[in-house]
Amino acid sequence: MKDLTMLLDELKDMSFFNKGDICLIGCSTSEVIGEKIGTVGSMEVAETIFNALDVVSKETGVTFAFQGCEHINRAITIEKSQFNPLTMEEVSVVPDVHAGGSLATYAFQHMKDPIVVEHITVPCGIDIGQTLIGMHIKHVCVPVRTSVKQVGQAIVTIATSRPKKIGGERAKYQ
């Protein structure tokens, strides 16, 4: 998937991925292949995307989390080593192609020690196919513009975050 490789390379060049961070991935494999979100799904597309992200993880030290679809309330598949019981609640669900989506399913099947959490707050994310990852991005969410606008047929939206600016007109900011 040339466009995915180009996108990930561009994000690496921008220093979008930071060692130790968790980057959220939302993906409709249906949209990638030109179909309506949630209709056909593709484990083959999921495998391609997961493997490309795995390479980025090994190169940059970023960890990826995978958002499931609305049928599992957009719950997040993560490595158990990333679990923080003070800020996350584990839920009892296993992502499935028809309830969770192909990429979350593939990730759950291929991660070392996966668990699913109800909610997560991460500093950045990549949304492939308008899966609505914003609910899991740390405030304040900031769009990231890239030259790659689609992966396959799916629209790509990328977000990072910045600290809130508080204090009013007399406050100073960096």
From Swiss-Prot:
InterPro entries, sorted: Antibiotic_NAT-like, DUF436
Gene3D superfamilies referenced in this protein's UniProt entry, alphabetically: Hypothetical protein TT1679
NCBIfam families: TIGR01440 family protein (TIGR01440)
Family matches, as Pfam families: DUF436
Protein name per Swiss-Prot or TrEMBL: UPF0340 protein SAB1998c
Superkingdom of the source species: Bacteria
HAMAP family: UPF0340
Family: Belongs to the UPF0340 family.
